[in-house]
């Protein structure tokens, strides 16, 4: 059955036997959806529909308690544990909070407590719930929520998260302490990760929550370590008798922060319900501007003794409640599908939608990612679809609703020619991305390439914005990057909304950009798949534009961050006569590229020319500081121990790298001896 079919049944007129069967079927359906969402991270219904069905089941069981299903979603949290990780039983059950969906319901929760209370208020992070166990102040293991009773042991992955303390910041740690929190990926990191995934693996994550959950469930912790996950702590689970529990929830959060955990910047202590309403109003309006996704707000009774008095249900605490924001997923209709052309020629399908409000914004366009996604989701022109603002930023079509499909719905096909310049569209190596072959002859690519060229991390021409670039291209005043440096005052003031002062500011900004670093210039010229990090690596390796132009494939693939695909892109770039002409025009008009300064390494008998691995934490050095220090005296610092490793510098909590060094007979240097050697 579908959600709509459940809603369409007139359950209030069913006979008792039929009603019981309906309740059982609804409970089974929700259990299956919970499994798909919590365990497999592959939901097939919207959050809004799940919440409505859950409330329907609650209402039916409240009215007919004799029909309450055994072991249903009303009694437990999440789903079953995936195979592939060791399962561990939680020392204290990981419950979840009851939900409310309006201020009126939130007021009811407040009034039922029957005390004059303070509420600790915080955002409800949309990530992966985790429980981290500490023994005598040191990280022991980490477990996912799982089904609330037991979860997956993901210790090695969690330890890679930079803001997870491996040692509690206290001289008197409790014997045992279980800290709970949410692992998230912020919006900007999610977008960057998806760009990388699209380029290197031809797939993307649907949203930041799926990206965080998928990362933590990876078997290779080295891959996880490259993803900028963060932990936000929200409380504790099990604790030993020697733990001195604070008197309030707010003080507990401050204590966790003092231990080294990150807590939300948006926590607030409300002294009455009026302040609760103010907090709700503030966070509802600030939600879109937060760096991370939240799907609601959490309100907890602040007094710990009062929490104990109020108690728990089988599902979770009665002293806390989650207010869930209105659904960010709504239905709309696909009016048409158009194809946009990006900087590298990538053709992206965009759905033109019947305008609909999503998260306070009127959405009429949504990305369809690529033609493979359209086919996988079976999206057609004329379909009713679910629309979501992914990451609260980019509207996307989540899925079609084929049960409402019209007979004249049109299948979407990839065009054979560019919709802008009519050049041929190619699909290289059978990847999901199709590209226009027009290059600089395609106005869409030209415009996007020029926007990239002037961007902050490239040439940083800050007064030359995207809209002005579009105006200049449309007026045929610029076509190639060097044309920007030929613009004059009269040309700029002749454009719409360009007064004398604005025009002069643009010219000053252009002049200021004429001495870029080599790394900025490499990034600015827009070689496919070359990002900021790759540009730095190339600039530092070659030292000059001339050397970079003469780069050979065999040399390129030996450089950090440069694989075979990027190396091929670089070689192809310099084999294109138009690219060479564009770069030569820069030099002809007086662009002075600043080559990186070569740092001469000081000689050190112990470290120069040696391959070194750093492990553990140090009292007198930060890891980054120590790495830079070793490099400055000629050492090669690597991340893993092998037969080629000359020495391992070992701090506290060294772990497996120390063990491997000892097995291989690699020299181990402790911090106490390090200062003498340096």
UniProtKB/Swiss-Prot annotation:
Give the domain of life.
Bacteria
Record the organism.
Francisella tularensis subsp. holarctica (strain LVS)
Q: What is this protein called?
A: DNA ligase
Q: What is its EC number?
A: 6.5.1.2
User: What Pfam families is this protein classified in?
Assistant: BRCT, DNA_ligase_aden, DNA_ligase_OB, DNA_ligase_ZBD, HHH_2, Nlig-Ia
The encoding gene is ligA
Co-factor(s) = Mg(2+); Mn(2+)
GO MF assignments: DNA binding; DNA ligase (NAD+) activity; metal ion binding
Higher taxonomy = Bacteria, Pseudomonadati, Pseudomonadota, Gammaproteobacteria, Thiotrichales
Q: Which NCBIfam families match?
A: dnlj (TIGR00575), PRK07956.1 (NF005932)
Give the family per the record: Belongs to the NAD-dependent DNA ligase family. LigA subfamily.
Enumerate the transmembrane spans: none
């Amino acid at each position: 059955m579908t959600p709509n079919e459940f809603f369409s049944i007139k359950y209030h007129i069913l006979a008792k036997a039929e009603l019981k069967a309906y309740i059982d079927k609804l409970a089974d359906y929700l259990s299956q959806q919970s499994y798909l969402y919590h365990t497999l991270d592959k939901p097939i219904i919207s959050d809004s529909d799940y919440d409505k069905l859950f409330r329907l089941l609650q209402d039916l069981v409240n009215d007919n308690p004799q029909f309450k299903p055994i072991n249903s979603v009303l009694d437990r949290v999440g789903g079953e544990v995936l195979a592939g990780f060791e399962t561990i039983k939680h020392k204290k059950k990981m419950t979840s909070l009851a939900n409310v969906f309006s201020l009126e319901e939130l007021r009811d929760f407040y009034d039922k407590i029957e005390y004059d209370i303070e509420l600790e208020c915080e955002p409800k992070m949309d990530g992966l719930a985790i429980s981290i166990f500490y023994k005598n102040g040191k990280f022991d293991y980490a477990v996912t929520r799982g089904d609330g009773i037991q979860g997956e042991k993901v210790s090695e992955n969690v330890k890679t998260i930079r803001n997870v303390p491996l040692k509690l910041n206290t001289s008197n740690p409790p014997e045992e302490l279980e800290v709970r929190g949410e692992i998230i990926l912020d919006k900007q990191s999610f977008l960057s990760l998806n760009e990388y995934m699209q380029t290197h693996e031809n797939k993307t994550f649907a949203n930041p929550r799926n990206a965080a959950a998928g990362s933590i469930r990876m078997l290779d912790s080295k891959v996880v370590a490259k993803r900028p996950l963060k932990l936000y702590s929200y409380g504790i689970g099990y604790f030993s008798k020697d733990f001195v529990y604070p008197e309030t929830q707010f003080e507990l959060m401050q204590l966790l922060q003092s231990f080294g955990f990150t807590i939300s910047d948006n926590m607030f202590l409300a002294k009455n319900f009026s302040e609760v309403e103010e907090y709700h109003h503030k966070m509802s309006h600030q939600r879109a501007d937060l760096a991370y996704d939240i799907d609601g707000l959490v309100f907890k009774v602040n007094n710990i003794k009062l929490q104990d008095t109020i108690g728990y249900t089988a599902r979770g605490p009665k002293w806390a409640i989650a207010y869930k924001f209105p659904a960010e997923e709504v239905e709309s209709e696909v009016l048409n599908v158009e194809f946009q052309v990006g900087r590298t020629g990538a053709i992206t399908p965009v759905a033109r939608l019947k305008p609909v409000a999503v998260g306070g914004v009127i959405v009429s366009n949504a990305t369809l990612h690529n033609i493979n996604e359209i086919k996988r989701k079976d999206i057609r022109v004329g379909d009713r679809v679910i629309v979501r603002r992914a990451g609260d930023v980019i509207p996307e079509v989540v899925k079609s609703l084929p049960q409402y499909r019209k007979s004249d719905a049109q299948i979407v096909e990839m065009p054979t020619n560019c919709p802008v310049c009519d050049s041929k569209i190619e699909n290289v190596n059978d990847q999901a991305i199709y590209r226009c072959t027009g290059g600089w002859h395609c106005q869409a690519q030209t415009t996007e390439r020029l926007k990239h060229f002037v961007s902050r991390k490239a040439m940083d021409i800050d007064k030359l914005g995207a809209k002005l670039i579009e105006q200049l291209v449309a007026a045929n005043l610029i076509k190639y990057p060097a044309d920007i440096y030929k613009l004059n005052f009269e040309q700029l003031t002749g454009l719409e909304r360009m007064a004398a002062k604005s025009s002069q500011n643009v010219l000053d900004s252009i002049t200021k950009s004429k001495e870029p670093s080599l790394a900025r210039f490499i990034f600015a010229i827009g070689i496919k798949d070359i990002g900021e990090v790759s540009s730095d690596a190339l600039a530092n390796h070659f030292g000059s534009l001339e050397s970079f132009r003469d780069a050979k494939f065999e040399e390129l693939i030996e450089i950090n961050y440069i694989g075979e695909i990027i190396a091929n892109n670089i070689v192809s770039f310099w084999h294109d006569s138009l690219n060479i002409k564009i770069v030569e025009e820069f030099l002809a008009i007086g662009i002075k590229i600043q080559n990186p300064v070569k740092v001469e390494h000081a000689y050190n008998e112990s470290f120069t020319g040696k391959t070194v691995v750093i492990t553990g934490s140090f009292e007198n050095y930060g890891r980054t500081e120590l790495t830079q220090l070793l490099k400055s005296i000629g050492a090669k610092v690597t991340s893993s121990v092998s037969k080629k490793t000359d020495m391992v510098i070992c701090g506290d909590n060294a772990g497996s790298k120390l063990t491997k060094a000892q097995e291989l007979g690699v020299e181990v240097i402790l911090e106490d001896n390090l200062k003498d050697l340096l």
